[in-house]
């Protein structure tokens, strides 16, 4: 068991990690991507200029207290209005977060207040205090296969029929949320992934403050790989390709452990190749049964057991962290096309 876990991601992948982490400790901090531009989140960020609330709402629901009060409020948070009027498609939680953010003039204060109502013992934090956009270089959309097309927006990137080659954040070098940096520095375990690789996982290492904190923290760092490649973003990607893409976007980024579902890499030959590839992240690879049978989803209980084992085998024995080379700038699972998360 570990005392403090920080999970970075968004959408269904982050929900799975949080559901696993809370089995190990009540003190879980979610650091959530803030680039969603679809569904209810997209409408609210456009109309009210707020941080998109959908993934933040889902993280709060994942960490809500198991008490009757907490479960009731988690259900309320997730309730989505029907009909065809102005509120159609909006979850109550999205509207509450948008309203609290306006009243309190601070998205972190809004999340803390709603977390208090739900009985969350940890925290849910945006990775940046402002809404971001994701921009991608995509190939395969032009007659000349060597040509890239610039695609902007999380939904457009997640659903492109082309091949995503590289992503970047707008604005460039955005500030990290101060409380997220503090949580990473104080954690015992930091978990990145699973999730949409280009729009939920990689954005965290593109925020200078978060990247610096991940290098500087003494926490054990684990990377959880997806169970399957996603249509659109990573269609046709091998497990090895996921690692190469992460390393390409974050030179010098390292983790201690990479967790891969055993069924995804059945042959010893492939596993040995992955172990060699993982050395570029200075990581040890763990092949384990972490899938929910018959689904492309992680099983929270199985994932919790693997994370617990990773911590138990090396508590206090990890390599000293690489010191950050710059001041840390702060404050200034489902496919992302699924509106159920927004």
Swiss-Prot record:
The effect of residue 325 to A/S is: Lack of phosphorylation
Origin: domain of life: Bacteria
Please give the residue positions where the record annotates the modification Phosphothreonine.
Answer: 325
Q: Which GO terms describe its biological process?
A: regulation of cell shape
Report biased composition (Basic and acidic residues) as residue ranges: 333-342
Q: Matching Pfam families, A to Z?
A: CofD (PF01933)
Q: Which GO terms describe its molecular function?
A: LPPG:FO 2-phospho-L-lactate transferase activity
Chain segments carrying region Disordered: 318-342
InterPro entries linked to this entry:
CofD, CofD-like_dom_sf, Gluconeogen_factor
How is the protein altered post-translationally, as described in the entry?
A: Phosphorylated by PknA and/or PknB.
The protein's location, in the record's own words, is: Cytoplasm
Q: What does this protein do?
A: Required for morphogenesis under gluconeogenic growth conditions.
Instruction: Give the UniProt family note.
Output: Belongs to the gluconeogenesis factor family.
Protein's name according to its UniProt entry:
Putative gluconeogenesis factor
Q: Which organism is it from?
A: Mycobacterium tuberculosis (strain ATCC 25618 / H37Rv)
